[in-house]
């Protein structure tokens, strides 16, 4: 029933948005390897861009086995911290899209090293960016200076921040309330600010 329900949901989404929208499916490390492969087979007709974190990313060998059996590309990496770990992940051909998070992988320097390792393996980055407008601006500068970017995550700046739990205040802050400038988003693209800094 689980696989059937998941497939039906994705079928409805694909029907609603059509073929001109890329579906990036976050599985949040919830499946065992065999189930991840089974789900991938069922979702192939809906042509998702990738399956993100179908299994826990702590076993790079197993992620490589899953990736080898799935025709849908795998994206992973938001919980990986060092460029050494990304190198091990990519040596096992465990993903097609690298989900490095600037906030945990060593900032700009670490992310540029990871991008270079990914490029050497013919892989693209899809930077992880769920938390704050400051991180959105940092990611925007990073992607503007990096060749092998597929797409990037862009949280809604007018919705409550996913990082509001970190303040301990209980106040729901919108991202646009935290900074003076929100990059312009138009037709699926963000404008890179001309002014210095993030």
Regions found by a protein language model. Name each.
Residues 1-69:
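Metal-dependent enolase-superfamily TIM-barrel catalytic cores that perform enediolate-based chemistry
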Residues 41, 47-50, 58-191:
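Shared catalytic-loop signature of beta/alpha-barrel
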Residues 190, 194-198:
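Extended hydrophobic packing segments that form well-structured cores
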Residues 2-5, 55, 106, 131, ...:
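Catalytic cores of large soluble enzymes that bind and process phosphate-bearing ligands
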């Amino acid at each position: 029933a689980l696989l059937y329900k998941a497939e039906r949901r994705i079928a409805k989404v694909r029907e609603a948005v059509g073929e001109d929208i890329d579906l990036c499916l976050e599985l949040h490390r919830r499946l065992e390897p065999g189930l991840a492969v089974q789900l991938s087979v069922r979702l192939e007709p809906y042509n998702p861009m990738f399956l993100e974190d179908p299994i826990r990313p702590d076993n790079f060998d197993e992620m490589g086995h899953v990736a080898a059996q799935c025709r849908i590309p795998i994206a992973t990496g938001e919980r990986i911290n060092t460029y050494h770990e990304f190198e091990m992940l990519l040596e096992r051909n465990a993903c097609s899209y690298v989900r490095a998070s600037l906030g945990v992988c060593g900032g700009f320097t670490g992310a540029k090293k990871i991008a270079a390792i990914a490029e050497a393996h013919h892989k693209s980055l899809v930077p992880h960016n769920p938390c704050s407008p400051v991180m959105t601006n940092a990611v925007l500068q990073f992607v503007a200076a990096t060749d092998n970017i597929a797409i990037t995550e862009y949280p809604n700046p007018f919705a409550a921040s996913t990082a509001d739990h970190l303040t301990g205040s209980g106040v729901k802050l919108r991202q646009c309330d935290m900074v003076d400038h929100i990059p312009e988003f138009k037709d699926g693209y963000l404008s890179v600010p001309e002014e210095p800094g993030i």
